[in-house]
């Protein structure tokens, strides 16, 4: 059969078809190999999973941004939340209640998405209240810093994974650090910390959540199974949200 004008036939006889397993972006074809030893087919599936998780995460962050904007820009909504401790307390408790069914039904569609939406909305209102109680300039600074840190840490983790580095060892260290943060936060309710201690606590908190971003991104690349996309998105969402709130608190205290 004649070839269309401008096209030429290419013989595949001299090409090793098995080499396709090692194709990556550096060769100009396919997608970058996520980490050493990953087969071509598994690499393609893993990239699809990662795109799905980041798609869900982007939707969560967008929803949080929109709800926070509504709370900040609408004084009646803000007054209702800040003037009703019961409502605000309920919104703070709901995410903790939803964590359990989210874990149980993370594979059951569409229940998992409904629970995820409720989880995100309840947290978004609390974030909105925190932003409404802070000067707009500081909120913008915290947002820019958070985006910069998250982007840098994510890029580094993907690069490190490709070079064969593993961050699973961070799990026990970060969990212990998180327990220390929770206990210290509880102690602050009865014995307020001084300015220096508060600054140290804020810096340590930011460091812990930065570590969690690296750890959970590494899990996304290597360890989360393909049906755990909800759990992966929730983990990264909480990491980013906690880092933003920590930076917001540090900047607010520094401004005061």
From Swiss-Prot:
The chain crosses the membrane at residues 53-73, 85-105, 113-133, 138-158, 167-187, 189-209, 228-248. It is found in: Membrane. It is a multi-pass membrane protein. Its main location: membrane. Signal peptide: none annotated. GO terms for cellular component: membrane. It comes from the Eukaryota. Coiled coil: none annotated. Keywords: Membrane, Transmembrane, Transmembrane helix. Pfam families: Bax1-I. Belongs to the BI1 family. This is BI1-like protein. It comes from Arabidopsis thaliana (Mouse-ear cress).
């Amino acid at each position: 059969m004649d070839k269309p004008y401008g096209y030429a036939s290419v013989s595949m006889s001299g090409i090793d078809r098995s080499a396709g397993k090692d194709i990556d972006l550096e060769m100009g074809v396919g997608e970058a190999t996520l980490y050493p030893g990953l087969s071509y087919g598994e690499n393609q599936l893993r990239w699809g999973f990662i795109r799905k998780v980041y798609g869900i995460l982007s939707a969560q962050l967008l929803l949080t941004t929109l709800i926070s904007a509504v709370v900040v820009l609408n004084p009646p909504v803000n007054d209702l939340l800040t003037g009703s401790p019961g409502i605000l307390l309920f919104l703070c408790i709901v995410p903790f209640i939803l964590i359990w069914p989210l874990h149980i039904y993370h594979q059951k569609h569409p229940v998992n998405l409904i629970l995820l939406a409720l989880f995100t909305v309840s947290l978004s209102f609390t974030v909105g209240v925190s932003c409404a109680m802070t000067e707009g300039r500081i909120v913008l600074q915290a947002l820019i810093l958070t985006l910069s840190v998250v982007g840098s840490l994510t890029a580094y983790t993907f690069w490190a994974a490709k070079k064969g580095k593993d961050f699973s060892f961070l799990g026990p260290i970060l969990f212990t650090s998180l327990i220390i943060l929770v206990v210290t936060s509880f102690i602050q309710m009865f014995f307020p910390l001084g300015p220096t201690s508060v600054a140290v606590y804020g810096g340590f908190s930011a460091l812990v959540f930065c570590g969690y971003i690296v750890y959970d991104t590494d899990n996304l690349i290597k360890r989360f199974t393909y049906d755990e996309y909800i759990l992966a998105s929730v983990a990264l969402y909480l990491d980013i949200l906690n880092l933003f709130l920590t930076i917001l608190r540090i900047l607010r205290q520094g401004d005061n």
